[in-house]
């Protein structure tokens, strides 16, 4: 971006610039996000005395920046809003997301069946609320047919609870 003036580095950025390079060389397969996490932990573990030279350097850079760009004002770029999708497409996407969320996992969560997927997913996206699944206690080694039957009973129980809640509102 031409004409863009970067902000001066803060103390952490001054310190992490060299540390990031070292960490990346020592761990070539480490992802940048992991390196950032490690740097954050390391920075927090430093004492004030260990951090002081980096704060001083950051202050020096800030002063130089102010002299070089006297009219500089930090103006973060705002994200451009993406236009809303059509209702039908929102339902399809929400339904697919919900279906993926509701697949069996190691915690054995209850599953909403059939047409309730699309309705629940659409309601979730419409109300901007998350759908919370309740864990189900099923003993290890439980036969698959009984697991499914147990799930259906849990689903019926969940529906009854929801109907009772709607009656009170």
UniProtKB/Swiss-Prot annotation:
Keyword DNA-binding listed: yes
Keyword annotations of the record: Acetylation, Activator, Calmodulin-binding, Cytoplasm, Differentiation, DNA-binding, Nucleus, Repressor, Sexual differentiation, Transcription, Transcription regulation
Keyword Acetylation: yes
Region Sufficient for interaction with EP300, annotated ranges: 52-84
Region annotation (Sufficient for interaction with KPNB1) ranges: 4-81
Broad class of where this protein is predominantly found: nucleus
Signal peptide start and end residues: none
N6-acetyllysine: residues bearing it: 81
Example GO biological process: male gonad development
Entry GO CC: cytoplasm; nuclear speck; nucleus; transcription regulator complex
Residue ranges, annotated region (Necessary for interaction with ZNF208 isoform KRAB-O): 92-144
Maturation and modification: Acetylation of Lys-81 contributes to its nuclear localization and enhances its interaction with KPNB1. Deacetylated by HDAC3.
DNA-binding region: 5-73
Subunit annotation: Interacts with CALM, EP300, HDAC3, KPNB1, ZNF208 isoform KRAB-O, SLC9A3R2 and WT1. The interaction with EP300 modulates its DNA-binding activity. The interaction with KPNB1 is sensitive to dissociation by Ran in the GTP-bound form. Interacts with PARP1; leading to impair its DNA-binding activity.
Homology family: Belongs to the SRY family.
Protein name: Sex-determining region Y protein
Species: Rattus norvegicus (Rat)
